[in-house]
């Protein structure tokens, strides 16, 4: 195979990029905008979550690259070529169980979307410092992660538990007034509980949104004829196909999702 060197790493010619993921050599298309897309869309590795790509602000997509915690939506494939990428799928079973138990027992998650990325960063710090990892130091590293559920206190409790090698009991049964573990906490902590964007059912179709080029205009007609002739297109849905409400919004329902004939566009 013909190869060339980019920043000291090996990348193959012909639109493919070679590197290792969880100890296994992989070759992915160079068309992906960043490492996260290659992991999720081509390799079907979904523990790294997409919360804000390509902004790199939320930390949900954190992986290890040569042992260092990196947000994968900020890494071009050229920079990853020839290197070793580790996701939670590739972490040892003992470590996985330790993190899952700690986050479940400490109540260190609620929705769980951000936690897999936090676990990866915690692993990087524990690998480096072990039981000597200080709570305030780990708190500083969590500045790279956004969590709107927990307030971080119980996240730090869970990380401290793992760093010290402790094994707290996980209470799974009880009644009113009993402190119990969150449902599916262990799966959520490791990124093994699928969210909508993680699902890959057989024969799944993908939707593409088409917007008008005019910020403010009256819709006179919608012609889907040409779109239906495009290769791979199964159907085209417009406002007339939606029997329910067509407006949405955070405070007021003032954002049109699908605009019917006779309606007005209102995009800034």
Predicted segments, located by residue:
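Signature of N-terminal electron-transfer/Fe-S-associated modules in redox systems
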Residues: 1-174
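Flexible, low-hydrophobicity surface segments
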Residues: 163-268
